[in-house]
Amino acid sequence: MSQIDENIRYGGAANETDGEDAQRKAQEREAKKAEVRKRLEEAGQKKQKKGFLTPERKKKLRKLLMNKAAEDLKTQQLRKEQERVKVLAERTVALPNVDSIDDHAKLEAIYNDLFSRLCNLEEEKYDINHITTETETTINQLNIEVNDLRGKFVKPSLKKVSKYDNKFKKMAEAKKEDGSKNLRNNLKTVKKESVFTQIANKKKSDKPEWSKKKEEKKEESAPEPVIEPVEEEETAASEGEEEEEEADEE
């Protein structure tokens, strides 16, 4: 009795069930941990597959590059403007106050100085233009040679011409060739008849009713053809030949 009481008091059979529940819970906990670990590994693999440049990072990088390009363009334009102002300041000369000068010799000297300076600038401009045209022609020739070696054909720069200009030119040439040419000759001739002529032609072609009735009566009263024997046909043919001979003799 004492052992049974102790088992009942300290849990006995209940201890076995509690141990099974604890074991099952531990297994469930381990399974949940393994599932969470697996999910974390999959998420890490997905992040690794995406790489460093995610769409958000690409967007930010594109924005930064655009801002940098805009800043560089502004600085380049400012630098060019400063260089232009500097070159103009070096090349241009401050004009003297001509209104306050009364001496003719001084005015003539100023005029000669400015004129000689202008001539020099025009010569430099002509030389620069000549050099640029030569370089452009050489570049074009080299491009043509390179394309020929590669086997490519460069489209020539075609001039835009209005189609109406060509039409007017052709018309002018045709007028020069045939000055007295009548355009009505090319038109199609259509024969027109008046109403009166149509009625007259209709009357000529139509037969009167009394003639139509006569023809119908003749057709009705006409005898039916009779088939004659062969001997009668031969006698008729001989009689016809004799009549023809008599007619020839007469």
From Swiss-Prot:
Tissues in which the protein is found: Strongly expressed in body wall muscle during embryogenesis, reduces during the larval stages to adult. In late-stage larvae and adults, expression is evident in the proximal gonad of both hermaphrodites and males.
Keyword Repressor: no
Any one GO BP annotation for this protein: muscle contraction
Transmembrane stretches, start-end: none
UniProt family annotation: Belongs to the troponin I family.
Region (Disordered): 1-59, 194-250
Gene3D superfamilies the UniProt entry points to: 1.20.5.350
Bias-annotated ranges (Acidic residues): 229-250
Biased composition (Basic and acidic residues): 21-45, 206-221
Any one GO molecular function term: troponin C binding
Known role: Troponin I is the inhibitory subunit of troponin, the thin filament regulatory complex which confers calcium-sensitivity to muscle actomyosin ATPase activity.
SUPFAM superfamilies xrefs: Troponin coil-coiled subunits
PANTHER family: TROPONIN I, TROPONIN I 1
GO CC list: muscle thin filament tropomyosin; troponin complex
Domain of life: Eukaryota
UniProt keyword annotations, A-Z: Actin-binding, Muscle protein
Protein's UniProt name: Troponin I 1
Record note on disruption phenotype: Worms exhibit abnormal locomotion.
